[in-house]
Protein backbone atom coordinates (compact mmCIF):
# COMPACT_ATOMS: atom_id res chain seq x y z
CA UNK A 1 0.00 0.00 0.00
CA UNK A 2 2.80 2.42 0.85
CA UNK A 3 4.56 1.76 -2.47
CA UNK A 4 1.39 2.72 -4.34
CA UNK A 5 1.22 6.00 -2.43
CA UNK A 6 4.91 6.66 -3.05
CA UNK A 7 4.49 5.99 -6.77
CA UNK A 8 1.43 8.25 -6.91
CA UNK A 9 3.29 11.10 -5.19
CA UNK A 10 6.28 10.65 -7.54
CA UNK A 11 3.93 10.93 -10.52
CA UNK A 12 2.28 14.00 -8.98
CA UNK A 13 5.69 15.64 -8.52
CA UNK A 14 6.55 15.01 -12.19
CA UNK A 15 3.20 16.39 -13.32
CA UNK A 16 3.37 19.47 -11.09
CA UNK A 17 6.96 20.37 -11.98
CA UNK A 18 6.31 19.99 -15.71
CA UNK A 19 3.13 22.08 -15.37
CA UNK A 20 5.07 24.73 -13.45
CA UNK A 21 7.69 24.85 -16.22
CA UNK A 22 4.97 25.56 -18.75
CA UNK A 23 2.83 28.00 -16.76
CA UNK A 24 4.96 29.71 -14.11
CA UNK A 25 8.60 29.80 -15.24
CA UNK A 26 9.77 32.44 -17.69
CA UNK A 27 13.45 31.49 -17.80
CA UNK A 28 14.15 30.10 -21.31
CA UNK A 29 16.91 27.83 -19.98
CA UNK A 30 14.50 26.10 -17.60
CA UNK A 31 12.03 25.63 -20.45
CA UNK A 32 14.69 23.60 -22.30
CA UNK A 33 14.53 20.86 -19.68
CA UNK A 34 11.95 18.38 -18.53
CA UNK A 35 11.61 15.87 -15.73
CA UNK A 36 12.25 12.30 -16.82
CA UNK A 37 11.56 10.63 -13.46
CA UNK A 38 11.56 11.19 -9.71
CA UNK A 39 12.82 9.02 -6.85
CA UNK A 40 11.11 9.81 -3.55
CA UNK A 41 12.65 8.82 -0.22
CA UNK A 42 10.80 6.45 2.10
CA UNK A 43 9.86 9.29 4.46
CA UNK A 44 8.53 11.45 1.56
CA UNK A 45 10.77 14.39 2.54
CA UNK A 46 13.46 14.17 -0.16
CA UNK A 47 12.95 13.76 -3.88
CA UNK A 48 15.70 13.30 -6.45
CA UNK A 49 14.43 14.85 -9.68
CA UNK A 50 16.13 13.53 -12.82
CA UNK A 51 16.30 16.11 -15.60
CA UNK A 52 16.79 15.76 -19.31
CA UNK A 53 16.89 18.15 -22.24
CA UNK A 54 16.96 17.80 -26.00
CA UNK A 55 20.37 19.46 -26.35
CA UNK A 56 22.63 17.21 -24.27
CA UNK A 57 25.46 19.76 -24.35
CA UNK A 58 23.38 22.15 -22.21
CA UNK A 59 22.27 19.68 -19.56
CA UNK A 60 24.47 21.11 -16.79
CA UNK A 61 23.22 24.65 -17.54
CA UNK A 62 19.64 23.36 -17.33
CA UNK A 63 20.32 21.61 -14.00
CA UNK A 64 21.79 24.82 -12.57
CA UNK A 65 18.78 26.82 -13.80
CA UNK A 66 16.43 24.33 -12.13
CA UNK A 67 18.37 24.69 -8.87
CA UNK A 68 17.94 28.48 -9.06
CA UNK A 69 14.18 28.08 -9.64
CA UNK A 70 13.83 25.52 -6.86
CA UNK A 71 11.76 27.88 -4.69
CA UNK A 72 9.02 28.15 -7.30
CA UNK A 73 8.84 24.37 -7.64
CA UNK A 74 8.84 23.83 -3.86
CA UNK A 75 6.04 26.37 -3.42
CA UNK A 76 3.92 24.70 -6.11
CA UNK A 77 4.45 21.27 -4.55
CA UNK A 78 3.62 22.55 -1.06
CA UNK A 79 0.36 24.02 -2.33
CA UNK A 80 -0.74 20.95 -4.28
CA UNK A 81 0.63 17.94 -2.40
CA UNK A 82 -1.03 17.08 0.88
CA UNK A 83 1.97 16.02 2.93
CA UNK A 84 2.92 16.74 6.53
CA UNK A 85 6.17 18.40 5.46
CA UNK A 86 7.34 20.03 2.26
CA UNK A 87 9.41 17.89 -0.10
CA UNK A 88 13.07 18.89 -0.49
CA UNK A 89 14.02 18.71 -4.17
CA UNK A 90 17.43 17.60 -5.44
CA UNK A 91 17.95 18.15 -9.18
CA UNK A 92 20.39 15.91 -11.07
CA UNK A 93 20.94 15.10 -14.71
CA UNK A 94 19.49 11.86 -16.02
CA UNK A 95 22.29 9.59 -17.26
CA UNK A 96 19.96 6.88 -18.56
CA UNK A 97 20.11 8.09 -22.17
CA UNK A 98 23.90 8.41 -22.10
CA UNK A 99 24.21 4.92 -20.63
CA UNK A 100 21.86 3.49 -23.24
CA UNK A 101 23.90 5.08 -26.04
CA UNK A 102 27.12 3.60 -24.61
CA UNK A 103 25.54 0.15 -24.41
CA UNK A 104 24.27 0.47 -27.97
CA UNK A 105 27.77 1.42 -29.18
CA UNK A 106 29.26 -1.59 -27.39
CA UNK A 107 26.69 -3.93 -28.92
CA UNK A 108 27.27 -2.47 -32.38
CA UNK A 109 31.04 -2.86 -31.99
CA UNK A 110 30.57 -6.52 -31.02
CA UNK A 111 28.41 -7.16 -34.09
CA UNK A 112 31.10 -5.81 -36.42
Curated annotation (Swiss-Prot):
GO terms for molecular function: ribosomal small subunit binding. The keyword Glycoprotein does not apply. The keyword Secreted does not apply. GO terms for biological process: maturation of SSU-rRNA; ribosome biogenesis. InterPro entries: KH_dom-like_a/b (IPR015946), RbfA (IPR000238), RbfA_dom_sf (IPR023799), Ribosome-bd_factorA_CS (IPR020053). GO terms for cellular component: cytosol. It is found in: Cytoplasm. HAMAP family: RbfA (MF_00003). Monomer. Binds 30S ribosomal subunits, but not 50S ribosomal subunits or 70S ribosomes. One of several proteins that assist in the late maturation steps of the functional core of the 30S ribosomal subunit. Associates with free 30S ribosomal subunits (but not with 30S subunits that are part of 70S ribosomes or polysomes). Required for efficient processing of 16S rRNA. May interact with the 5'-terminal helix region of 16S rRNA. This is Ribosome-binding factor A.
Amino acid sequence: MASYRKQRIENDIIRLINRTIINEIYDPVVKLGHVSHVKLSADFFHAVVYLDCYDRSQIQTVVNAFKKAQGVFSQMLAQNLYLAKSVKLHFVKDDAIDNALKIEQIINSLKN
